[in-house]
Amino acid sequence: MSAPSPVANGKAEASGTAAEEQSPIHILWINAGLSCDGDSVSLTAATQPSIEEIALSVLPGLPPVAVHWPLIDFECGPVQGADNFIEWFFKGERGEIDPFVLVIEGSIPNEAIKPEGYWCGFGDNPETGQPITTSEWIDRLAPKALAVVAIGTCAAYGGIHAMEGNPTGAMGVPDYLGWDWKSKAGIPIVCVPGCPIQPDNFSETLVYLLYQATGQAPMIPLDEHLRPLWLFGSTVHEGCDRAGYYEQGQFATTYDSPKCLVKLGCWGPVVKCNVPKRGWMNGIGGCPNVGGICIGCTMPGFPDKFMPFMDEPPGGKVSSTASSAYGAVIRRLRNVTAQTLDKEPKWRRTGEKLTTGYRPPW
């Protein structure tokens, strides 16, 4: 998916403006890992910015962009043919489109443990007619990419497909390439987890990388698990509208309650995610905002360490018991203060005498 006017066959058309003369930054998107395509679907809801704003390069200072995304790539292949969409990826391998950002969706299966066949592939080898595995594409393209972005928890850390007992040996991109891996531009793997992603988190991260590629932003700040620090630096609890109830020791026992959901299985106090603050679409929604528990889907230990999802977290029993004890005292003190503050001052009344305490100078 890309803007039709400035880019054709990877070359800029001459039109007199600096933006149109500039070669585009290509986005090569591989969604052939083990996944449900939920991250691609989620991204269509992005608004800050939207994928259309990125593809059309309408944001101030954003370079021309050509997005080659299997979900909605309306330009298809380099010669406008649906049958050769995969040619963009061969061009990336041959170095004919540069720079490009490699986006990987889905966890990476271990092809080495399979004696025959393959776990997942993306396009065919034109010489043999056999599928090219997802891991082989990563081997071919990652060394030539400006940056590698793992979209969704499956690509970031393995996710559901990498659960204990899985037959594929699935893993995340950092597990496959190495956690210390860096692109030719010196950029670490960038992980935007979520099951699926919060759409604006990914679009904002992608825009940051595009600005960085053109020298308009410093090196992207990441935490120890390669997540953008400004997006995943706080916990769900720290941005949750229900956090005040936790402090006061008030916990929901049913899902129709507005109180804290910890006893119903919410992991918000320890999960790094900004969904309660950011919402989901146009700032609306987000798991605890609409009555859902946080199941830890942005964390490297998801899902194994958070199961079973509907049970109270082990540490929650201790913390909620302690919170209930001191929360009762806090509530009582606040009620006393509230009763004092919930009354008008006594001097606001009728009468012939001024009782506000004002002393006239005459």
Across the structure, where does each feature detected by a protein language model lie?
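Short, well-ordered, mixed-charge alpha-helical segments that flank or form enzyme active sites
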Residues: 36, 110-112, 156-160, 198-201
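Loop/turn elements at helix/coil->beta-strand transitions in domains of secreted/extracellular proteins
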Residues: 98-100, 144-147
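Catalytic-core regions built around general acid/base machinery
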Residues: 129-145
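Iron-sulfur (Fe-S) cluster-binding modules
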Residues: 1-85, 89-103, 186-189, 204-362
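Hydrophobic/aromatic beta-strand patches that form the interior of the parallel beta-sheet core
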Residues: 28, 147-152, 190-192
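Class I SAM-dependent methyltransferase SAM-binding "motif I" and its flanking Rossmann-like core
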Residues: 154, 158-185, 190, 194
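Short acidic, glycine-rich surface-loop motifs adjacent to enzyme active sites
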Residues: 99-114
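Glycine/threonine-rich flexible loop motifs
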Residues: 111-131, 159-166
